[in-house]
Swiss-Prot record:
One of its GO terms (cellular component) is small ribosomal subunit. GO terms for molecular function: rRNA binding; structural constituent of ribosome. InterPro entries: Ribosomal_uS4, Ribosomal_uS4_bac-type, Ribosomal_uS4_N, S4_RNA-bd, S4_RNA-bd_sf. Part of the 30S ribosomal subunit. Contacts protein S5. The interaction surface between S4 and S5 is involved in control of translational fidelity. The keyword Ribosomal protein applies. CDD domains: S4 (cd00165). This is Small ribosomal subunit protein uS4A. SUPFAM superfamilies: Alpha-L RNA-binding motif. One of the primary rRNA binding proteins, it binds directly to 16S rRNA where it nucleates assembly of the body of the 30S subunit. With S5 and S12 plays an important role in translational accuracy. It comes from the Bacteria. It comes from Alkaliphilus oremlandii (strain OhILAs) (Clostridium oremlandii (strain OhILAs)). Residues 98-158 form the S4 RNA-binding domain.
Amino acid sequence: MARYTEAVCRLCRREGMKLYLKGDRCYTDKCAISKRTYAPGQHGQSRKKLSNYGLQLREKQKAKRFYGVLESQFRKYFEIADKQAGITGENLLRLLETRLDNVAYRLGFGSSRAEARQLVVHGHFTVNGKKVDIPSYLVSAGDTIAVAEKSKSSAKFKALAENAKGNTPNWLTVDVEKLEGKVVALPSREDIDLEIAENLIVELYSK
């Protein structure tokens, strides 16, 4: 599957915010955007005022990069969100947030979404007792996500979960000893810590 090949720290600088793409490094002084808050490139320090379309595009790019989703799949999520009842922008973020790779990351079973995605692909997780190796798999309220039995002997997962303890969002619970978590409810907009104007994404795709 196609993925971003650009240095991920440049992506954060381009969007002007931390996208938490490098795991633990993002929480240290080594984070690139902590050192250089301007965009990469020769003219990065002279940001131009964006047009309305430019603002809409930037918000879309933020969301895509935050969750590590490429354009074709992102558009499919929008089409699904647009058909659901409720507010389209919030529906879109909820779909992205309930991807298995993101949930594994939120539970602390990956230091970044990229690492969690790789671990999902390699078959390290189960959903309701069945192995799922599709990062885009959407979890539902009541689902139990666990580290597969064959992987529980790895000290890596316990260390990751211990480090993430206390940072689990309200819509999830995690049992560090059992290396499993549960989706207690679908996330509301207040549960999603992405600083983004999702209404601008809706406007962009609605043209």
